[in-house]
Regions:
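Extended, charge-enriched "interface" segments that sit outside catalytic cores
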Residues: 2-171, 188
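Conserved phosphate/anionic-ligand binding catalytic regions in large, soluble enzymes, centered on
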Residues: 34-50, 174, 178-207, 260, ...
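Glycine/aspartate-rich loop-and-adjacent alpha/beta segment that forms the canonical ThDP
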Residues: 3-6, 12, 31-41, 45-98, ...
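Active-site cores of enzymes that catalyze phosphoryl transfer or operate on phosphate-rich substrates
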Residues: 128-150, 216-268, 272-276, 694-761
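Thiamine diphosphate
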Residues: 314-433, 636, 648-659, 706-886
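ASCE RecA-like P-loop NTPase motor cores
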Residues: 527, 541, 560-744, 748-750, ...
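Cofactor-binding active-site loop characterized by glycine-rich and histidine/acidic residues
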Residues: 189-350, 354, 545-601
Length: 886
């Protein structure tokens, strides 16, 4: 592992107690403790703040006297890595240069001894290296000038435009350029970049090769492109192909909203998808963060922990903190005395931090080289904390002197990095001339770039393979593979009974297919056709309701403890890729990851399943900003499938509601599909159709829970899997005389079966029960055709289990009015509006359900076995709403 780098002595334990009697301790040990003190604590006094406003604590361990050593004391033998030091004083100077300069190492969160040794070795070996060549330094100066010039041009032309200036951290541009060059050195061919809006426009032009004229036009309120763009320019992504001395690197800057840090899991999901398809060695995720957001946003901590799990690891991410030491108007200063930094959340995941002064570009480049080497060797996260300042306010509409007058006075007197770096180069051409040249390059040099960036380009459509024809023989073959037990393995009795039932089912064309079997057969048939399937979420291997059983845990004990068999991964040699990943207990990071995965793997069926649909609101940012709006804003097409177990069963407001109404409120422009299948065959066809759709769209499924999974009436015949496709509307096949029907009750989901039981028990042939299986895009034509078959129809009722302020009613009302035949009246029967939602009493829930069904089918009658008191008042909370009055 270390063949490319020199070996260094293993650091000894860190000494915290002052040495009072050095004569009793061997001198090599004292020197080792002195060196170790700098390795572990030197960053606390390092010269990493350009403004030098951060408090510098007294760290006595960094003084030779603390260890009983005198500065003029000779070193008896040369020290590996410090051969030029002849005395303790010279050693101290050397250690200060290495660990207390403009680049400092913080490995306080790294518990792995091997990684710490490597980091110490790299710091000690590179500190003596000569600065970059004059040519390299001139190139860096050019990059800094380009960054500075961009900010000045935008400020002059569009003084009122928000650009989220990079001024104070312009070194980010040479940093990102160096990352790309170093990535090429390591054989990276795909670099996935995520970053917030601070400095993004600058990076689009100066890193992503975007046309300056194009970006300026997006800022011009009078331009045609500004009038037609679907998102703000500092949210847009781009893709470019960069040439490096070691080969070409394709760099993709991911689109993202203003919701800070949300793009982080998206980028690592995209990276993992690329790695799964092409090999993990060729792809690098790089995420740029703001200091306040990195410390403050929970999605950061969730994702840092998520990627430590094998199913979500992108083999290490390079993090870059643009640390301007302030968040909006709130100071976010380093506190070395209290050991408080914006990167502290990364200590929990063993990530080292390279802290570097943004006014020292040469050290910035050294930090990049060390960080990339570390990531490639250890396949682990590492952070570069680029410490600068914010010359202007949060945005150009801000007046920072209102809240930070003293800080702004210091910043106003501080020279820019271009001036400082130009001065360090000595005999370089006059700066005024260089700035004029940089302006010409900016205005004229990007438009004709041969590898110009593609902005807001649509993600490539999936090259889907048509679904192969299904036959009973094929399903039997797949069932044999699904139920095959590896030789010598003992499986759980429950699994044995289940697989026996599946074999019996497929042996009979009229056999009833349970939901678990239908889902597994859907995946198996897709995999057999060469499609890939990825399914992740909490407990997805077994399923929250013991409804999937895609992972079998061996019951043998002994050396088989923990061993599993995944039947869907062992169907045949030529099958598609199947991944099933039990996620940690997080929604936000996982949903963001899977969305990113779906973008980079459009040919795969990528699925996230919530433990209960209610918990999807823990990931609301990704629903609102990415899934619902990503295609319209950025052209990002995704076939991500979101399964939300949904339905009122008397288990309370936290385990009943997939927020159907909220999803429907987000529906527009055919941005996604929302479905609520009521049979196992529908479930089977829905999943297969989603995988094969030529134009990918996200699919939101109000999926079954315990009652529907166990309802035998929802289990379709085996022949239903062989025929047809997903039906957006299901007709009432029990109606024998359509002219007798006076009322049609429409519903979606399991409430249909409660309505059917009550209707059939009453023997009422004047009521037809029609299921709307897809709620968006709403099947107007299909439903109009069904309703048109009932020539004497008087009333259409929409019945839903959900409260009137939730569920589908307020969305479907306009759709139903558009297809209502003649003089029919439209009403809705729902639970009454409620702030919390479902009832937590099973008895009260059942009484509510009976009253709801009775109201939907006829006159509002008291439920059988009704009770007085609080329950009765809740039972009365069923609303029958006339559409015109709603």
């Amino acid at each position: 592992m270390f063949s490319r780098y020199p070996e260094y002595a293993t650091p000894v334990g860190f000494a915290r107690a002052e040495v009072r009697d050095a004569s009793r301790i061997a001198k090599p040990l004292l020197i080792g403790r002195f060196i170790d003190a700098h390795r572990h604590a030197g960053f606390r006094v390092a010269d990493i703040d350009p403004l030098r406003l951060a408090a510098c604590p007294d760290v006595p361990e960094l003084d030779p006297g603390f260890h009983g050593l005198a500065p003029d004391e000779p070193l008896d033998t040369p020290l590996v890595g410090f051969e030029t030091a002849r005395t303790v004083g010279e050693l101290a100077q050397r250690l200060e240069l290495i660990y207390c300069g403009a680049l400092a190492l913080d490995c306080s969160g790294v518990r792995d001894e091997t990684r710490r040794r490597w980091l110490f070795g790299r710091m000690e070996s590179t500190a003596s290296n000569p600065v970059p060549s004059l040519g390299q330094r001139h190139a860096v100066l050019g990059q800094l000038l380009a960054a500075e010039t961009w900010e000045r041009v935008v400020a002059e032309r569009f003084a009122d435009a928000k650009r989220f200036s990079l001024e104070g951290c312009e070194s980010l541009i040479p940093l990102l350029t160096a990352v790309i060059d170093n990535a090429g050195r390591h054989g990276i061919v795909r670099l996935l970049l995520g970053m917030p809006h601070r400095g993004r426009l600058n990076a689009l032009v100066n890193v992503m090769d975007a046309s300056a004229a194009d970006v300026l036009a997006r800022l011009d309120p009078d331009s045609d492109i500004a009038a037609t763009q679907t998102d703000l320019p500092y949210h847009l992504g781009a893709t470019t192909r960069k040439r490096t001395p070691h080969g070409a690197v394709t760099v993709q800057l991911a689109h993202n909203p203003s919701h800070l840090q949300s793009v982080y899991p998206v980028v690592v999901g995209m990276a993992r998808a690329w790695q799964d398809a092409h090999g993990e060695a060729g792809c690098l995720p790089v995420v740029v963060h703001g200091d306040a957001a990195f410390a403050g946003q929970g999605v950061v901590t969730e994702t840092l922990n998520l990627v430590r799990h094998a199913g979500y690891s992108p083999s290490g991410t390079l993090h870059v903190i643009v640390n301007n030491q302030i968040g909006f108007t709130t100071p976010n200063r380093m506190d070395a005395a209290a050991h408080v930094y914006c990167t502290d959340v990364a200590r929990g995941v063993d990530a080292p931090v390279l802290r570097v002064n943004a006014d020292r570009p040469d050290e910035v480049l050294r930090a990049v080289a060390i960080a990339l080497d570390y990531r490639m060797i250890f396949r682990a996260d590492i952070l570069i904390d680029l410490i600068g300042y914010r010359r202007l306010g949060h945005s150009e509409h801000d007046l920072p002197t209102l809240t930070q007058p003293a800080l702004q006075a210091v910043i106003g007197a501080h020279p820019g990095v271009v001036d400082l770096y130009h001065a360090s180069l000595g005999g370089t051409a006059p700066l005024d001339g260089l700035r004029r040249a940089a302006l010409q390059v900016l205005l004229h040099g990007h438009a004709g770039a041969p590898d110009s960036a593609r902005h807001s380009s649509r993600e490539a459509d999936a090259t889907t393979t048509p679904l192969a024809e299904l036959s009973l023989e094929r399903l039997r073959r797949l069932t044999d593979a699904l139920t095959c037990v590896p030789p010598g393995v003992r499986i759980h009795e429950f699994i044995a009974r289940m697989t026996a039932r599946w074999r019996d089912t497929v042996a009979d064309e009229a056999g009833r297919v349970d939901w678990s079997f239908a889902e597994n057969l859907a995946y198996a048939s897709l995999l057999d056709d060469g499609f890939g399937v990825r399914l992740s979420g909490m407990d997805v291997g077994r399923g929250t309701f013991m409804h999937r059983h895609a992972v079998w845990h061996f019951q043998d004990g002994g050396d088989r403890v923990g061993a599993v068999h995944v039947p869907l991964g062992a169907l045949s040699a030529g099958q598609g890729r199947f991944d099933i990943v039990n996620s940690p207990l997080t929604e936000e990071a996982v949903l963001g990851f899977e969305y990113g995965y779906s973008l980079a793997a459009p040919e795969m069926l990528t699925i996230w399943e919530a433990q209960f649909g209610d918990f999807v609101n823990g990931a609301q940012v990704f629903v609102d900003q990415y899934i619902a709006a990503g295609e319209h804003k950025w052209g990002c097409r995704s076939r991500l499938t979101v399964l939300l177990p949904h339905g009122h069963e008397g288990v309370g407001p936290e385990h009943s509601n997939g927020y159907l109404g909220r999803f429907l409120q987000l529906c527009a422009d055919e941005n996604m599909r929302v479905a609520c299948p009521s049979t196992s065959a529908q479930w089977f066809h829905l999943l297969r159709g989603q995988a094969a759709a030529r134009q990918p769209k996200p699919l939101i499924v109000m999926s079954p829970k315990t009652q529907l999974y166990g309802d035998a009436r929802s289990q379709s015949a085996m022949t239903s899997l062989l025929e047809g496709a997903f039906a957006t509307v299901i007709q009432d096949d029990s109606v024998t005389d359509a002219m007798r029907v006076r009322k049609v009750v429409l519903s979606s989901g399991k409430v249909h079966y409660a309505l059917r039981d009550a209707r059939d028990a009453a023997g009422d042939t004047s009521i037809a029960l029609v299921r709307v299986e897809q709620l968006y895009p709403f099947p107007r034509l299909e439903l109009a055709c069904v309703l048109g078959t009932f020539g004497n129809l008087e009333e259409v009722v929409w019945a839903q289990e959900e409260d009137v302020n939730q569920g589908a009613w307020r969305f479907v009302r306009d759709e139903l009015e558009a297809v209502l035949p003649g003089a029919c009246r439209l009403t809705a029967v729902c639970r009454a509006a409620s702030a919390s939602g479902a009832h937590s009493s099973v008895r009260a829930h059942q009484a509510e359900q009976r009253r709801l069904v009775a109201s939907a089918l006829g006159e509002l009658a008291p439920p059988a076995g009704g009770h007085a008191g609080a329950e009765a008042s809740r039972v009365g909370a069923v609303e029958r709403v006339e559409a015109a009055a709603a």
